[in-house]
Amino acid sequence: MKVTKYLPILAVCLMTTGCNSKKEAVLTSGIDLANLDTTAMPGTSFYQYACGGWIESHPLTDEYSRFGSFDMLHEKSREQLKELIAELAAKKDNAPGSAAQKVGDLYNIAMDSVKLNKEGAAPIKEEMAAIDALKDKEEIYTYIAESQKKGIRPYFTMFVSADDMNSSMNMVQTYQGGLGMGQRDYYLENDEQTKSIRDKYKEHLVKMFQLAGYDGATAQKAMVAVMNIETRLAKAARSQVELRDPHANYNKMDMETLKKNFPTFNWDAYFTTSGLNDLKEVNIGQPAAMKEVADVINTVPLEDQKFYLQWNLIDAAASFLSDDFVAQNFDFYSRTMSGKKEMQPRWKRAVSTVDGSLGEVVGQMYVEKYFPAAAKERMVGLVKNLQTSLGERIKALEWMSEPTKVKALEKLATFHVKIGYPDKWKDYSALEIKDDSYWANIERASQWDFNDMIAKAGKPVDKDEWLMTPQTVNAYYNPTTNEICFPAAILQAPFFDMNADDAMNYGAIGVVIGHEMTHGFDDQGRQYDKDGNLKDWWTEEDAKKFEERAQVMVNFFDSIEVAPGVHANGELTLGENIADHGGLQVSFAAFKKAMETAPLEVVDGFTPEQRFFLAYANVWAGHIRPEEILRLTKLDPHSLGKWRVDGALPHIQNWYEAFNITEHDPMFVAKDKRVSIW
């Protein structure tokens, strides 16, 4: 996936085939024939043909809204983390302040359901009272800053990341937010499914306020106040598609201009409390949203804003309180919005919390035990091959002029590649894990994250810093550092198998590598130059040709019906779809080049070329609930797994040739209608 400052994190829906008992098959081709549905035709639905057997043999369990082989790998990683963490948690002699003490104690606190249930709402009572004690609206600005330090984000989000126009320097930035349902469409759309979710959200608000100690009448009043404020914020917010435009979301201003543009917002109080006393400039990502924040604070009665601030506290803390809070939180966010039927066991939630709060501490332990050096060496070779392949494809493009090709090749040559784990680890010595409440420890961990972040404000960007931990089963491209990153956890079977042949590895991890590289040249990435600056390096004619070709992709995915009456969003998913398309093209070309010196044979009746596409399709094998389809279609810039196969392959000529797809097959797309970019 592409990482931007706005969406801190290939998508969590990345999937691949799970481990199997056919050791001989894995050692030869990496393709498990049991994954296939040979009653299906490759040209009718290649997804069903390649993944139907896997889908049938892996029914969706109640704790998931979607589950694929990616999730299998994630579960494997979590089991490995549990082994590391539980060993430390069992020790009684961990040195105070040591990494072992922090990891072990936080896990034990998370697992202590007796203590959590005895405490109930007590861990948030003091903060609830502090909100109640706010005397006037001026104190709201100080409270917003204090709460953001603790990981609570009312009204908007503030963060520090590279300046898009001066990517070597970090800058303070703001981003729209403050919505309990996360996305503006849930407040504004009036289809039956959205209205039902909105009604259930109102019920959820009332129940949570009651759990926090309010009587029914006051909880109802609080719900109305929260909905009024959040609806106002939603109306001023940009759509998911609008948030993809880097120029529209770049609005840097000095402090004088900031105060002039938002005169009613007390920036001095906010930034001073945040620890940013000498701030010179800031990027207001979405000015209309920030203007509405200022108007809400200025015009909404203080009592209503107190309810809203308390809701943000309750919502942030709910997962770390007693079981009644956790259950109600699950009921709305997981059951209603995603279709999950059962909560994950406590140990899984505890491991995830430790992983999220002490990421690189756990990551260092993970790498030492589970990441072989040979995997990194093999990946370095694959990345070089893919980089060469993309360069050759750029040189051969008929639609692009030489001046733009030169710039594109310069950018490709300067890719910063990160594999496995960072060369230097974060220092968590200032973070204290104490024997008090679970929520108090989460707040301290959030405070540590906040301090780590604001220390970068106005400082040079550290290009050696990682935006994912090594134990994350994922990958990313970051445009402002022009880097591609492949954490250790994704570099294992079945994404990447040292014992499988090139057909499998190029079809799986090879396409992932090509996908991330292509992000540097998708509709967003192409707007950043080799140094990571938001700077136009295209000729006007080439930019127009790119946009025309990209529109073919938009139109094709817009036509896909993902559920009855619901279509994919071709604009929202454009960047990821271009990256899938480019990843397939680039990796297949590199694969064919590799076979010139190391030819492969037919295995299990499949040619090497066929196994390449089977490996790719198996990456996306999985189940997904109807509720999750609808949720992801609203907000996810990635296409659904099925359509990353059946939507991507009809535009790949080599796939047609590998499986003899003709105009008589339903997936066939005429050559003049196919996408052709990278």
Go through each PLM region and give its residues.
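Bacterial N-terminal signal peptides that target proteins for export
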Residues: 1-7
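Short secondary-structure subsegments characteristic of cysteine-rich extracellular domains
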Residues: 12, 63-85, 218-236, 505-511, ...
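C-terminal motif of bacterial Sec signal peptides marking the signal peptidase cleavage site
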Residues: 15-18
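Bacterial signal peptide processing site
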Residues: 20-22
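Active-site-surrounding "flap" and adjacent substrate/cofactor-binding loops of secreted or lumenal enzymes
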Residues: 24, 38-44, 49-114
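Hydrophobic/aromatic-rich, well-ordered segments within soluble, folded domains that form packed cores
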Residues: 35-56, 187, 191-210, 574, ...
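Noncatalytic, helix-rich "gating/capping" subdomain that lines the substrate-entry/channel surface
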Residues: 88-381, 385
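Intrinsically disordered, low-complexity linker/terminal regions across diverse proteins
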Residues: 226, 261-264, 283-287, 344, ...
